[in-house]
Amino acid sequence: MGTAVLEVRHGSPQRLVRDLHDFDVLILPGWKNSGPEHWQTHWESAFPHMRRVLQADWDAPRYADWATRLTAAVAGCRSPVLLVAHSLGTALVTRWAQEADTRAIAGAFLVAATDIDRFEGKDGNTYQGFAPLILKPLPFPAWVIASRNDERVDFERARAFANAWGARCVDAGLLGHMGSASRLGVWPQGLVWFGQFIAALGGQDTRA
């Protein structure tokens, strides 16, 4: 399934992701990885310029290990890099960005930024080395996509995170944690926002 198919099938605006060929896109899932019904998996299948950063242990995440994999993935890219992160993947990005060489990073698209300081340890999850959440300006452009009924972060907290990171906060409405349970499929609206984000990187008008 290519970009053109997605545009026709879902009637998405013309700016969807037509400039994606200028970038390497790294997909960063959260705790337990993104399954077959997750929008990240759909995107990875649909676009050849997107690839997932695979972690050795998805169930007991260790920041040092995840950061090492991310650094290696970025080093292997030939084009400017876009990071597409979900949930714990957003905490990986914000911490990694403060210590890594980020010159290759063109921007980050951060979906469902988990409030790890409040939720670490719940449901049996442990995030070794990810907390506390880093609330410093990111050295690259970023958008935060936040849901108003995300069980892992209050909307106002997500908006405060975006402000601390120097990122734009996009109100996604009532989509829960925006994972597999939200049943977003290929998530056409998410692709629209991602396309607008890419357009904004080039200083273009991002209105559909």
Where in this protein do the model-derived segments appear?
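Active-site catalytic motif of lipid deacylating hydrolases and related acyltransferases
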Residues: 19-79, 203
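Active-site nucleophile loop of the alpha/beta-hydrolase fold
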Residues: 30, 55-58, 109-118
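Catalytic histidine neighborhood in serine/cysteine hydrolases
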Residues: 49-51, 163-179
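Gly/Ala-rich beta-loop-alpha elbow adjacent to hydrolase catalytic centers
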Residues: 84-93
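Conserved hydrolase catalytic core segment
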Residues: 95-106
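Short beta-strand/loop motif that positions the catalytic acidic residue
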Residues: 138, 144-146, 150
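Conserved alpha/beta-hydrolase "acid-adjacent" motif
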Residues: 151-157
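Post-His helix in hydrolase/transferase enzymes
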Residues: 180-194
